[in-house]
UniProtKB/Swiss-Prot annotation:
It is an enzyme of class 1 (oxidoreductase). One of its GO terms (biological process) is mycotoxin biosynthetic process. The chain crosses the membrane at residues 11-31. GO terms for molecular function: heme binding; iron ion binding; monooxygenase activity; oxidoreductase activity, acting on paired donors, with incorporation or reduction of molecular oxygen. Its main location: membrane. It is found in: Membrane. This is Cytochrome P450 monooxygenase grgG. It is a single-pass membrane protein. Its EC number is 1.-.-.-.
Amino acid sequence: MTGFAEIIISPASFIYFPLLILVGHALIFILNTLRPKAFPPGPRGLPGLGNLLQVDRIFPFLTYGKWAKDYGSDTPLGVKKGATNVVVLNSSRLVRELFEKRGAVYSDRPWQFMNNTWIFKDDLKAAIFQNSSPWLTSWRRDFNKNFGPAAITRLRPIYEAETARLLVKLLEAPTASGKDLEAILVCWMMSVPCLGVCGRRPDSMGDHGFEIKQFRHCSDEYATLVAPNAGDLFPFLRYLPEFFGMAEWKERARAVREAVLNTGTQFLSAAREQRAALDEGKSIAWESVLAKMLREQREKNDDMFTVTDMGNTAFHIVSAATNTSLAVFSIMLLILAKDPQLQQRVRNEVLEVSGGATPTATDLSSLKYTEAFWNEVHRWRPVAPQGVAHAPSQDDIYNGHRIPKGTAIIMNVWNIHHSEEDYDEPEEFIPERFLQHPLGLRSDHTLDAAHLEASASRVTWDFGAGRRICPGMHSAKHSLLLGLAKVLWAFDILPPEGKEIDLSLETGFVQEIALHPKELNVVLKLRDGRTKQDLMDHYSQTYAAEAEVMGWKDGLYQ
């Protein structure tokens, strides 16, 4: 015993024991980067790195698509990114089998270090990253009540007026392009979600401390941090100290967490104002999401959602709606600016259906070619080319392949939407494919029910699949199609003089939280035959109906 004690307290032990611990952790890490037993097939990787250096850093979905040709698109593709297990689904048939038929297992989210340890911790929840639970079920139910298909009808005056307001703002900035045009579009895209969650427009919440510019900065920083990062791939990086700038991300994470909490408080403050007006019996037809939560918390003593959850819910609804909607609408504008004949065809349908008058929401169901254009945009340039990763809640076996619990399951939307097996000329932008076949499939694909079932195809996978499909997809489609129809009625969409529009994936797009164009280099010019008064009159007419729903009088609650 004496000899052992001497070893323990010897000077050499202060070197060797930490070294042994370090070597032990390194060995565990290297073992974790190896492929699990019976893991789905995939390319051989390197110890400590896995397949990390083999995957395209900018557009990883392209690499996965190439590997699918080697291992089969209907076979799950096993990939190792450092210590992280990744399984890629490269066909619609695989998505159906795992995300839809086995939805009870494949509806969780992968554990992510930054999310779970630094930003959300135990007191902050984000529905998009939550595992299946009664909390998530209740959240999605409340969301669908307020933004689902039935709610869209009740909110129609708001969609109409906010889009009419967009036309006026575009008219007031005739040379807006790039970031200036984005700022106008973002205000419009935030309006319906903001009114829906707290009863206030985003540009009229200054008295609650809310500013659109600060919100966008917070949202962008948040999106950067919550993506899988080095701390997930190389766990030892989590323990780096903050001095000498070795873990600068820790300070960023604290700042983002604080900004998300503050923004949620601002939304909640606006909702409390509407709640008070409703309680006073003011004439307000629309009870916002947070106002409803506050009422139920009071009346039912319902503690399912804390006040922090409520504010965080508002932040995520508005943030998600803004980022993806801006990407989709920007792509649509760029495509139409680049192809004047296509633009005129879509406009002609809008004018024919509306009888030359300003198009309204009731016209949307008759805009068949415009909807085909919408579907082709999502097929050709999906803004979520890898979706949002799912994770199995338990170990699972599929066709003899073992998929460990917690594995990141990626739906390769890009590869599915560009499959030569399913689409004629998949690299070409052809809206007519959705007029010839309801799913846009090849001309030799029949409409036979058995054939469609075997193909497992959908119009688009851009909104996700299974139990985690985007609950806001109906609202987004309604809002953006209405916006497109009204913009085409009022404006010509043109490329800036002397500039080319680049729609190439490799040179014209950036992959961040959404796949989006590098630059929104278009300008909107008032069409011949349209006047400023036309647009002002349209907004005045639609605002009257919106004000009645929202209980406004001179911008205040009646």
